[in-house]
Curated annotation (Swiss-Prot):
S-adenosyl-L-methionine binds at A32, G33, H34, D52, F79, D100, Q107. Keywords: Cytoplasm, Methyltransferase, rRNA processing, S-adenosyl-L-methionine, Transferase. GO terms for biological process: rRNA base methylation. This is Ribosomal RNA small subunit methyltransferase H.
Length: 299
């Protein structure tokens, strides 16, 4: 199995400013691309905690990380539940959080997971294979209005109403490639030639299946309480919807606490910055093209 190539790896490691004795939480472990480099920098007193819903990813990461060190804990659950596990471990503060919100290339490569719009597979798209809701339930079960809402809110799908109507009129849709064909045939030829419209539709359905935006918002609301002074949270985003959520959340944290009209020195509790991939990284890793690394530091 070819390992998932982590995006913005150098920037992540540099900006985490890893304390060898610190506690670092990778909330989207994947195949430990980022985590393996974090673990290499930790001493025996440090700890890495990794979350992933995908049990296959957890097992592969365990094998990979075990070759580096044993001071890690892997948790097969959605990162939205991170607080429950940190409380169980009596951890009140961490030295860094990392989220990589992209779908791993391994998940895309496995046609049977149904994430890829270029491979024949079932309409699945579940990151947690134990959950009941699948892409098939949405594609073949939701009404036109609900589909349209998902397409607009999760991916800004162009001509979402036409795509939703096309799906409803062509049911039952059996697999990923049939869905791609239905999407393409629902839209004007000029739009289809310009850009593969299936990409945004698949993104919207995947987000709905896994409740990704709600999970992200719930996590952000609890996250900063766990950061130590001078520690950071790093979030890699890949599309405008999730990026806007992170950007707006960070923006609210750095807002001046005092009325600007008052003669009081500006007080800020957080510092933020954004990093984009270099042309060199994009050339080496196509996935990096749409990525952004957003960083918030507790002061």
């Amino acid at each position: 199995m070819q390992l998932h190539k982590p995006v913005l790896l150098k920037d992540v490691i540099e900006n985490l400013e890893i304390n060898p004795e610190g506690i670092y939480v990778d909330l989207t472990l994947g195949y430990a691309g980022h985590s393996s480099e974090i673990l290499k920098k930790l001493s025996s007193k440090g700890k890495l905690i990794g979350f992933d819903q995908d049990s296959f990813a957890i097992e592969k990461s365990r094998q990979r990380l075990s070759q580096i060190s044993d001071n890690f804990v892997l948790i097969n659950d959605n990162f939205v539940n991170f607080k429950v596990y940190l409380d169980k471990m009596n951890i009140s503060f961490v030295d860094g959080f990392l989220l990589d919100l992209g779908v791993s290339s391994v998940q895309l490569d496995f046609a049977h997971r149904g994430f890829s719009y270029s491979k024949l597979g079932p309409l699945d798209m579940r990151m947690n294979l134990d959950q009941p809701l699948k892409a098939d339930d949405i594609v073949n079960g939701y009404d036109q209005e609900s589909l349209c809402k998902i397409f607009i809110e999760n991916a800004d799908v162009k001509l979402a109403k036409q795509v939703a109507k096309g799906i409803v009129n062509n049911r039952p849709i059996k697999d990923t490639l049939e869905l791609v064909e239905v999407i393409r045939s629902s839209l004007p030829a000029a739009l289809v030639r310009k850009k593969n419209p299936a990409k945004a539709v698949f993104q919207a359905i995947r987000i709905a299946v896994n409740d990704e935006l709600i999970v992200l918002k719930k996590f952000l609301a609890q996250s900063l309480d766990f950061l130590k002074k001078d520690s950071k949270m790093l979030i890699i985003t890949f599309h405008s919807i999730e990026d806007r959520i992170v950007k707006d959340f960070f923006k609210r944290q750095v807002k001046n606490k005092h009325d600007r009209r008052l003669p009081i020195m500006e007080q800020k509790d957080y510092q933020v910055k954004t990093i984009k991939p270099t042309e060199e990284e994009i050339a080496q890793n196509r996935r990096a093209k749409s990525s952004k690394l957003r960083i918030i530091k507790k002061l």
